[in-house]
Each structure stands twice: as C-alpha cells, then as structure tokens.
Amino acid sequence: MIDETLFDAEEKMEKAVSVARDELGSIRTGRANPGMFNRINIDYYGSMTPITQLASINVPEARLVVIKPYEASQLRAIEDAIRNSDLGVNPSNDGNIIRVAIPQLTEERRRELVKQAKSKGEDAKVSVRNIRRKAMEELSRIKKDGEAGEDEVSRAEKDLDKSTHTYTAQIDELVKHKESELLEV
C-alpha cells in the first residue's frame, strides 16, 4: 500500500514536470520554434484540432516559421488561429503556405515573458506540493489504520520529501533555462 502511494505520487509529479516543460516550451523566445504553436487549436469540421495535426511546421531560418496545411481549405482557419493567439505574431499566406516572421522581442516583452515563465513554474511547483500533501495524507491514513508500522511510514515520508525536492528542483531548472533563453539578446 505504501509503495503504491509513493509510485502514484511519483507518477503524478513526473506528469506535473512534463506539463511545465510543455507550457514553458510554448512561450515565444524571439527565435523560431515549432513548439510555440502546440497550444493552438483550429475548428476542423466541428472539433477543435491541434495545428500540428493539420499542417507541417518547419523552421527554415532562425526567425521564420513555414506552415504548410495538409488541406488547402484549412489555410485561412490556421492563419486566423495564429493571428488570434497570444503569440504576438502576424502570419502571411501566399495561397499555399503560411509564413510567420518572428519579430525581435523588446526588453519590456522579454521581462513580461520571464514573469509568465516564473508564474507557470510556480504553478507547477504548487501542483507538485499538492500531490505531496495528498500522498502524506494517504500515508497518515495507512499509519492510523495500522496497515503499516510507524518506521515504514516514516521512511516513505522521507522518500516522498526527496521526490518532491527532486521534482521542484527540475521545475526550477526548467524556469531558469527558459529565463536565460528569454533574456538572451
């Protein structure tokens, strides 16, 4: 029972770090990156579909993204979705492909994006801490019900604390990396 609780908590913490990695990856840095379009969804015959399933996304130059829809009929919808997203870019299409020029980030915008990255990192750390809290509650229930001895539960709590520290450190590292990426001119 203790092992299941620890395994479950580890799995959820891993998922929280993965979500943080994806969220931080979607923050624009001033360089072209296909990952910045991951959160954009397009209405495709009545269902919201990720842009990555409707078009190929390539980066031929450091500041240019080329998006080629698999269906020409989706060109306008993809262009509108990119324009209406929070990326701050202006796509242009030539009838076959969409070109997205990535503008230089201003100092003010960089600072804004750093704040956004820190906020997403903090949200992920809160998520990890909530997972830890729930696992600790489960461990104390196990101890109270007599399903395991005090020593076993104490050892499990230490392991849980170690895992929590490891995953929050990973999140801090991701945020630090993103921050340096954003502030790099």
UniProtKB/Swiss-Prot annotation:
GO terms for molecular function: ribosomal large subunit binding. SUPFAM superfamilies: Ribosome recycling factor, RRF (SSF55194). GO terms for cellular component: cytoplasm. Keywords: Cytoplasm, Protein biosynthesis. Pfam families: RRF (PF01765). Its main location: cytoplasm. It is found in: Cytoplasm. Residues 142-164 are annotated as: Disordered. GO terms for biological process: translational termination. The keyword Cytoplasm applies. Responsible for the release of ribosomes from messenger RNA at the termination of protein biosynthesis. May increase the efficiency of translation by recycling ribosomes from one round of translation to another. NCBIfam families: frr. Belongs to the RRF family. This is Ribosome-recycling factor. It comes from Mycolicibacterium smegmatis (strain ATCC 700084 / mc(2)155) (Mycobacterium smegmatis). The lineage of its organism: Bacteria, Bacillati, Actinomycetota, Actinomycetes, Mycobacteriales. The gene is frr.
